[in-house]
């Protein structure tokens, strides 16, 4: 009889803990969960894009200057 009561009490406690853990879970906001956060701050890919754009511009100017110098010789 005691073991049945103990088992029943432990089952009740386990169910209460299961509901309390479930209640602590909070879903992320839909706006940022799938599509990313929409803000005015620059993201990493924007910095990378600007850096690559600057490198390509410098390389293009250097190659143009070098090729025009090669043609004049």
From Swiss-Prot:
GO biological process, one term: neuropeptide signaling pathway
Propeptide residue span(s): 39-73
Modified residues (Phenylalanine amide): 35
Entry comment describing in which tissues the protein is expressed: Expressed in brain, the retrocerebral complex and in ventral, thoracic and abdominal ganglia (at protein level).
GO (cellular component) term, any one: extracellular region
Keyword terms, alphabetized: Amidation, Neuropeptide, Secreted, Signal
Subcellular location: Secreted
Keyword Signal recorded: yes
Family, similarity comment: Belongs to the FARP (FMRFamide related peptide) family.
Record's protein name: SIFamide-related peptide
